[in-house]
């Protein structure tokens, strides 16, 4: 279940879901309709932990990525081959780092979902070395696609024809 806002009604709905057996919830640090800000991220992660639950978080620096997308559009770079160009590794790593600092302050374990690069994974390694409980999911297929795309220009647009 995704949590996209933090208010009294959401808190009640989450408790109802917990009563039905749901123990993990997904949060987003990106996507305008789903993003939770840092304050709510902290409050949600802390509250879930206090209830014996945890959060899986999709980590990206939404502000910079949105700016990069606008720049790419202005340059006519609209194809799927430009996807990794507007989502540099550093923007995921920054968001993972920020999440881990927030989770540490909340005293809560956390899961990073859709991890896509080494820089972001290094943030997780550091947090684990410092005693934090961090789980991560790295979707192999998307990683292979992104790595191949970087090695073979226009791979996605060529493959998409078939």
Task: Locate predicted features.
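Histidine/acidic residue-rich metal-binding segments in metalloenzymes
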Residues: 9-28, 33-162
């Amino acid at each position: 279940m995704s949590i996209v806002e933090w208010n009294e009604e959401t808190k009640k709905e989450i408790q109802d879901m917990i009563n039905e057996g749901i123990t993990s919830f997904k949060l987003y640090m990106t996507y305008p309709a789903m993003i939770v800000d840092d304050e709510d991220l902290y409050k949600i992660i802390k509250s879930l932990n206090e209830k014996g639950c945890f959060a899986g978080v999709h980590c990206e620096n939404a502000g910079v990525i949105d700016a990069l997308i606008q720049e790419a559009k202005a340059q006519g770079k609209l194809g799927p081959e430009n996807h990794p160009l507007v989502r540099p590794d550093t923007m995921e790593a920054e968001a993972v780092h920020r999440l881990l600092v927030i989770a540490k302050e909340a005293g809560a374990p956390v899961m990073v979902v859709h991890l896509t690069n080494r820089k972001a994974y290094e943030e997780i390694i550091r947090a684990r070395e410092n005693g934090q409980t961090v789980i991560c999911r790295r979707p192999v297929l998307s990683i292979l696609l992104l790595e191949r795309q970087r090695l073979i220009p226009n791979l996605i647009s060529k493959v998409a024809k078939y």
